[in-house]
Curated annotation (Swiss-Prot):
Its EC number(s): 3.2.1.-
Lineage of the species this protein comes from: Bacteria, Pseudomonadati, Bacteroidota, Bacteroidia, Bacteroidales
Main location: membrane
Residues reported to bind NAD(+): 70-71, 92, 141-144, 161-162, 190, 247
Organism: Phocaeicola vulgatus (strain ATCC 8482 / DSM 1447 / JCM 5826 / CCUG 4940 / NBRC 14291 / NCTC 11154)
InterPro entries attached to this UniProt entry: Gfo/Idh/MocA-like_OxRdtase_N, Gfo/Idh/MocA_oxidrdct_glycsds, Glyco_hydro_109_C, NAD(P)-bd_dom_sf
Lipid attachment, kind N-palmitoyl cysteine: 16
Protein name: Glycosyl hydrolase family 109 protein 1
Length: 471
């Protein structure tokens, strides 16, 4: 009986195999699938790119601030500590916010700046003044682009909080305005100045990691305690309305600098996906007392990007759930590895460590992180020149541990010395385009999407990312 059953099952198996159609060889071959593409407008006649744009030196950088709610006042405070500056004007829709910021300036022993408030268009009067060089914009996201364009059109440089633009149309408008007016348009991305990031960038530029092949970044920040404090629930409303990675810049900015994006390489294609929205609708019900079955932004969004030179980037976004804060910041190179969260660590091939300057190198292997003492010695040895100058002062003044102060200081330093800024309008474009492009990918079944060349052909004009310094 057992023999008969065995013969029966073998017969069934052979029959099934005989009935299967062999997989054609051609189906296993690699095929090229055209990604979704968005239009790239032609550069208007007479315009040129603003890569490494320089403008005349400013003895004193005269600044006007727009938006004095959550982030603006701390920026005003930081600027009272930066030499070679004058705070000329302050603007907020609410008069009390402008008045509080004015007291920050006068309490620092400086002349009281002019105030603009009480009207939706009061900020335009600030931009129209002839005694301002730079407009510093820290409003809600939806007003960033309009204000930046108006400032440049009225002869001012524009520094815009993250994200500076939320759509491709806004991005191209900022690019064209900067190119047309020859004014700087910089996104205020602070995380590129954090201590581990800038030190690691210096190591990478010195070749310590070999060829950097893969980088990661994220914005993972449980905003539970902050949701009630966004004016008129603007941030929750934005997440309710838009799908995709709407806040990619903190993770993507440092990653792009490591890969020399639009300075020898460019982001070419991305694929994005998200989870369903669970926490968002609950927050709307909690704070706005209404149901939100239409809530668009998934609790967790992830994006994978491939560059022209065959490098890869992984970005995540999650502001909804109880996870430890993380910007990930990770790089993988042919000779080394770096990781910031949850702990700062480096890993190298043994021959990458100089035994004359780094202790205990015999204990290193390519399979484990270097000991803490070795990590500290490396970070000291490769401390970035910017941190060598500013670390002590930055940590004293503060602003997310000091990186905000360094960001503002470097902006002023470059303007006063007539140097290219550390971040240009194309950085702004590349880091902000994730909002529109990831949405497009997700809404089309996680389809590949081509990342536009915002430089319009000049992405390899500069050989590698670098910071400018006065001679």
């Amino acid at each position: 009986m057992i023999k008969n059953l065995s013969t029966f099952f073998v017969g069934i198996a052979l029959s099934c195999l005989a009935g299967c159609t062999p997989i054609p060889k051609e189906t296993t071959a690699t095929k090229e699938y055209a990604p979704l593409e968005v239009p790239v407008p032609e550069r208007p006649a007479g315009q040129q790119d603003v890569i490494e744009l320089t403008t005349p030196k400013l003895d004193t950088v005269r600044v006007g601030f727009i938006g004095l709610g959550m982030r603006g006042p701390s920026a005003v405070e930081r600027w009272t500590h930066i030499p070679g500056t004058k705070i000329v004007a302050l603007c907020d829709l609410l008069p009390e916010n402008a008045e509080k910021a004015q007291k920050i300036v006068t309490n620092a022993g400086m002349e009281a700046p002019a105030l603009y408030s009480g009207s939706e268009d009061a900020w335009k009067q600030l931009c129209e003044r002839n005694d301002i060089d730079l407009v510093y914009i820290a409003t809600d996201w939806k007003h960033h682009t309009e204000m930046g364009i108006y400032a440049m059109e009225h002869g001012k440089h524009a520094a815009i909080e993250v994200p500076a633009a939320m759509s491709l149309d806004e991005i191209w408008a900022l690019i064209n305005t900067s190119e047309k007016t020859r004014k700087h348009c910089m996104q205020l991305e602070n995380c590129v100045y954090d201590f581990f990031e800038l030190t690691t960038l210096n190591m990478a530029q010195k070749g310590l990691f070999g060829e950097v092949l893969h980088v990661e970044g994220s914005y993972i920040h449980n905003l539970e305690e902050f949701w009630p404090y966004y004016w008129n629930n603007w941030r929750l409303d934005y997440n309710r309305e838009f799908r995709g990675d709407v806040y990619a810049t903190h993770g993507l900015g440092p990653a792009c600098q490591l890969l020399n994006i639009h300075r020898g390489d460019r982001m070419k294609t991305l694929v994005a996906m998200d989870t369903k929205a669970v926490t968002g609708p609950e927050l709307v019900k909690q704070y706005q007392k209404e149901e939100a079955p239409d809530f668009q932004n998934g609790d967790h969004t992830m994006t994978f990007i491939r560059t022209e030179n065959g490098k890869t980037i992984h970005i995540q976004h999650d502001v909804m759930n109880p996870r430890p804060y993380s910007r990930m910041y990770q790089l993988t190179g042919t000779k080394g590895f770096a990781n910031k969260y949850p702990i700062e660590q480096y890993c190298f091939r043994p021959d990458q460590i100089d035994s004359t300057s780094i202790p205990d190198h015999e204990n290193l292997s390519m399979h484990s992180a270097v000991p803490e003492k070795v990590k500290e010695a490396l970070m000291s040895q490769y401390k970035h020149p910017i941190h060598q100058e500013l670390e002590e002062t930055a940590k004293k003044i503060g602003g997310h541990g000091g990186m905000d102060f360094i960001m503002d200081y470097r902006l002023v330093y470059c303007l006063r010395n007539g140097l290219p800024l550390d971040m240009d309008v194309y950085d702004l474009a590349e880091w902000c385009c994730m909002a529109d492009l990831t949405r497009l990918s997700i809404e089309n079944g996680n389809a590949p999407v081509a990342v536009p060349d915002f430089t319009r052909g000049n992405w390899n004009k500069v050989d590698g990312y670098h910071h400018a310094f006065a001679q």
